[in-house]
Amino acid sequence: MHKDFDEITARAKELGPKRAAILFPDDAHVIQATAEGMKEGFITPVLVGEKEHLTAVARKSGVPLGTMEIIDQKDPQEAANLCLDMVVKGDASFVVKGNILTTYLYRALIRATRQLSTDQTPCTLCFHQVPGINKVFVITDPGVHICPDLNCKQKILTNAIQVLHSLGCVNPRVMVLATRRFDGSSSTFAHDAEKLRRLGDEGKFGRCKIDPATNLFEILDRGSISVERLPDIFLVPNIETGNILCKSIDHILGGIRQCVTVGAGLITLTPSRSDGYEVRMGNLALGLVVASSLRGD
């Protein structure tokens, strides 16, 4: 696994540009990152949105659009569907969310994923870099599924492990987060964790190591955890847990987060609306590396 986002960015610069559909780039940070991503050789952008509006934003931001292709589409859902169709057809390697509600993009991704494979489901992978931890780790799924059942968790885990395999993490360590009750009995989440561990032992997910522990306290050694023992993937039981965990890492531990949402090999970058130019540049680099590794584009 990559040790930090600088390493991922360096890898992106080696790979060369990929065609990316930028969904509703009518925001200063989005259009600036798009232009710089093109300059750095990360992407060849296709801007999808209301042409008059995004052109005005680019002009106000001092960003020349030059030869960037623009597809004029005012309806947000139609625009999101169009972007995913481009990836399905091979006309783009990935989609980048701009100034639009994530819901539209998730709907389009779920639709496209089901068209390609009825037994897969999209999920969000949040890649985290934290000071003092010499590797990037993933939390899933804090974005798409509100409270996934066991079958859905299998699909989420399959997705996450496939992505990490493609990034060179040949035997990812997984922790399925759950809690024990005070009386010693197990919750539904703990039962799911045990079932997933058994499936992992049986080879259901390919090469991986699903930890029997269901929280970090169980693997502490004198108050600390070695990088080797720290999971590469944390599978959360529901969307609330995922959001709390991701935001806590961001704001309490001073972490850096980059999110991608993946389903049936379709890749969308889902930065937060509050993310600035530098974070979005890192997100483009991650998208390029994941697309090159997972899709072989």
Regions found by a protein language model. Name each.
Residues 1-297:
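Anion-binding alpha/beta catalytic cores of soluble intermediary-metabolism enzymes, centered on
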